[in-house]
Curated annotation (Swiss-Prot):
Pathway: Nucleotide-sugar biosynthesis; ADP-L-glycero-beta-D-manno-heptose biosynthesis; ADP-L-glycero-beta-D-manno-heptose from D-glycero-beta-D-manno-heptose 7-phosphate: step 1/4; Nucleotide-sugar biosynthesis; ADP-L-glycero-beta-D-manno-heptose biosynthesis; ADP-L-glycero-beta-D-manno-heptose from D-glycero-beta-D-manno-heptose 7-phosphate: step 3/4. Residues 1-319 are annotated as: Ribokinase. The lineage of its organism: Bacteria, Pseudomonadati, Pseudomonadota, Gammaproteobacteria, Alteromonadales. The active site is at residue 264. Catalyzes the ADP transfer from ATP to D-glycero-beta-D-manno-heptose 1-phosphate, yielding ADP-D-glycero-beta-D-manno-heptose. This is Bifunctional protein HldE. Keywords: ATP-binding, Carbohydrate metabolism, Kinase, Multifunctional enzyme, Nucleotide-binding, Nucleotidyltransferase, Transferase. Pfam families: CTP_transf_like (PF01467), PfkB (PF00294). PANTHER family: BIFUNCTIONAL PROTEIN HLDE. InterPro entries: Bifunc_HldE, Carboh/pur_kinase_PfkB_CS, Cyt_trans-like, PfkB_dom, RfaE_dom_I, RfaE_dom_II, Ribokinase-like, Rossmann-like_a/b/a_fold. ATP binds at residues 195-198. In the N-terminal section; belongs to the carbohydrate kinase PfkB family. In the C-terminal section; belongs to the cytidylyltransferase family. One of its GO terms (cellular component) is cytosol.
Amino acid sequence: MKISLPAFEKANVLVVGDVMLDRYWSGPTGRISPEAPVPVVRVNQIEDRPGGAANVALNIATLGGQVSLAGIVGEDETAAALTQGIEALGVVPKWHTVAELPTITKLRVMSRNQQLIRLDFEEAYPAEQSLALLASAEKELDKVAVVVLSDYAKGAIDKPEAFIAKAKAKGVKVLVDPKGSDFSRYRGATLLTPNMSEFEQVVGKVADEADLVTKAKELLKEFDFEALLVTRSEKGMTLITADAPELHIPTVAHEVYDVTGAGDTVISALATSLAVGCELPVACALANTAAGIVVGKLGTSTVSRIELIAALNLSHGESGYGVVSEDQLAYALEQAKLKGERVVMTNGCFDILHAGHVSYLQQARALGDRLIVAVNDDDSVKRLKGDGRPVNKLDRRMAVLAGLASVDWVVPFSEDTPQRIISRLLPNKLVKGGDYNVEDIAGGKEVIAAGGSVEVLGFEDGVSTTAIIENIMAKQ
């Protein structure tokens, strides 16, 4: 099936779980300490990354969803760093602060891309703190469509069964990334996403595909789960529900560099998709595609909307050129710039394509390696040109432009000027035809500020869409 990216910006998700900060101290090593037989690292780089449940929330935000994050933190510098890190990407913190406990921190000392030692700063959460966290999280249930319980066995999610029941009673789906061998703790959840190791820890060794399905259905019945999605590394994923045949989804990863955080990406994509009304098989397919992207990156990473769109297009055999959406174009432009290609952009109505247009676009293309043509949609053409225009509808105008050898990408826009889309894409060179002053060209200031340039090209004399229309009307 061909899958399009849903409107993730409409997703409202609450993540509840064990939040932590992954901190990295990195630098060169050149000598052994005189105090002990250990290397001395001269730290020249410190990096903080939100981890655990916070990484799940970041994944949802990066996909474009609206997300709040409930977790237990201390009253310390680490909590401040964690808060700053998630707020910068649009995640709303809903902390339960316990002054006497440290915010969980994993400090890694690195040199030459090797981890020399990891220092963990954490204490077990008392059961009453977990209850307090879940009680405060209940207040958010009326605002969301999906809740993710991100369990790293640190104690934030101690006994969530009552919380799950309250969420389900409000029509909120509850997804769980489980930990440990006791799945009864998650009784009543909508969906669990164990990996194969976690699944076998609960049900015992799985002999084959049929055995996996049988044991999964037993768990569904025993603990009142609606579905299980078992992630299986190079074998992809298997979705098991009570009332439908199992669904095996093959992996889409082309190269695997690091599986760190892949589980976070899976449940994040699932949650965001389900929150906007996707059917479960479609949500699983999107999650599988997202996982295939993230395992191709080093370290704990997130997947953006643009990366997911590009991966979906690739799986459908689409070339990435021609008529594209704005998100598709943003990704294609990023890839072109990484290759060192100079991207030129122009815009217009292009209602009746004529020789003057063709000549102009050839000139524009000659100024770089790739050419984007942004096209006014039908409503904006009517506002600009008056009743009776456009003569040709948007899809036809874009199809003709995309067929020209000089044009790489065609993208529509709905405003009267291309100011917004140019400001977002920021080509290397912005081109406009006619007798404009550079300072008056929409988007020109933004392109120049980003290090690009703006150029005005002349149109071929005596050829215009208006003249063609007038000539046709005169002969009728």
